[in-house]
């Protein structure tokens, strides 16, 4: 319906139905084993090859002079007046079970007053773990994304002092992990939920025909390793990962007022209500067919079909949440 028609007083009655359902998801897609986790690495390095967009001041000159001494080249810091280098922080995440020789993606960010890292090359930089040990070494050309285009709002928001080096770090040391605790393993849900934890234990017990799994709380499920797998734990873990569990999608509405977007997931129900907003008077009436109910998804679809703007929809959703008729969490960004 055209926007000019919306200038008229509208009375809308919506009778909306939606089935309640859960999605079957493999355990490996919504959980992980305790002990198998990423670790953060960090280091401080120098990006060179910048075309006058590097750091100013004497800090860089001192660092470069010290670095050159390691190669047997003695240079007075006062003679190194260059803006072609920048001091950067280098960070990376190392996944579990990564072996020496495997590669990691790396991010770099300017520490000082560099204008851009574009076309620069990161010199060899050791990456440390929280324990102070070196686990990887990073080096390579820095990418800061596409070229800035004059007049483009999106591209003007680029940050050329933050860069990325795909597979820019080489793992030098493996981080030790321990998954098995005695004769059991613990599954950790990525998002704690009592219902999903209980269903996970039930699905595992059903798969193996015995009560080997027990939900400890909303985030963890303890699984005893059957004797038949005592010498082949990896095969047992692989079987666990492939078990499908009916997982409820969390009822949540996320609003980004800057971009005018509304994101919603799960079976988000809404109670009966009457709302007057601008030129709209909206009445929601739930049907009485089994366990079906009105949902926010159908409400938003109906509003869009009537020509409501993103700002209109955001305002309506916020008012309904304040009134307590939306059965979901609301996050505003």
From Swiss-Prot:
Pfam families: FlgI. Residues 1-22 form the signal peptide. GO terms for molecular function: structural molecule activity. GO terms for biological process: bacterial-type flagellum-dependent cell motility. The keyword Signal applies. It is found in: Periplasm; Bacterial flagellum basal body. It comes from the Bacteria. One of its GO terms (cellular component) is outer membrane-bounded periplasmic space. Its main location: periplasm. Keywords: Bacterial flagellum, Periplasm, Signal. HAMAP family: FlgI. NCBIfam families: PRK05303.1. The basal body constitutes a major portion of the flagellar organelle and consists of four rings (L,P,S, and M) mounted on a central rod. Assembles around the rod to form the L-ring and probably protects the motor/basal body from shearing forces during rotation. This is Flagellar P-ring protein. It comes from Fervidobacterium nodosum (strain ATCC 35602 / DSM 5306 / Rt17-B1). The gene is flgI.
């Amino acid at each position: 319906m055209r926007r000019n028609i919306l200038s008229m007083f509208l009375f809308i009655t919506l009778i909306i139905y939606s089935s309640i359902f859960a999605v079957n998801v493999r355990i490996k897609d919504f959980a992980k084993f305790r002990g198998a986790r990423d670790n953060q690495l960090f280091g401080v390095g120098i990006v060179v090859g910048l075309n006058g967009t590097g750091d100013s001041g004497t800090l860089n000159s001192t660092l470069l002079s010290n670095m050159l001494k390691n190669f047997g080249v003695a240079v007075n810091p006062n003679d190194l007046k260059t803006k072609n280098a920048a001091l950067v922080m280098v960070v990376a995440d190392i996944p579990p079970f990564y072996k020496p020789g495997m590669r990691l993606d790396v991010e770099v960010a300017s520490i000082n007053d560099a204008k851009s890292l574009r076309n620069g090359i990161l010199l060899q930089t050791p990456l440390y773990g929280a324990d102070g040990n070196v686990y990887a070494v990073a080096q390579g050309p820095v990418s800061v994304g596409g070229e800035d285009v004059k007049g483009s709002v999106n591209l003007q928001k680029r940050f050329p002092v933050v860069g990325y080096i795909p597979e820019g770090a080489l793992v030098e040391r493996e981080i030790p992990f321990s998954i098995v605790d005695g004769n059991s393993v613990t599954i950790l849900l990525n998002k704690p939920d009592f219902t999903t934890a209980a269903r996970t234990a039930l699905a595992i017990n059903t798969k193996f025909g015995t009560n080997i799994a027990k939900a400890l709380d909303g985030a963890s499920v303890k699984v005893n390793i059957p004797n038949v797998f005592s010498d082949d734990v990896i095969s047992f873990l692989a079987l666990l990962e492939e078990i499908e569990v009916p997982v409820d999608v969390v009822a949540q509405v996320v609003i980004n007022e800057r971009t005018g977007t509304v994101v919603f997931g799960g079976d988000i129900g809404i109670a009966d209500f009457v709302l007057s907003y601008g030129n709209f008077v909206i009445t929601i009436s739930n049907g009485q067919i089994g366990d079906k109910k009105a949902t926010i998804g159908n409400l938003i679809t109906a509003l869009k079909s009537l020509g409501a703007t993103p700002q209109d929809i955001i305002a309506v959703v916020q008012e309904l949440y304040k009134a307590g008729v939306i059965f979901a969490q609301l996050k505003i960004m």
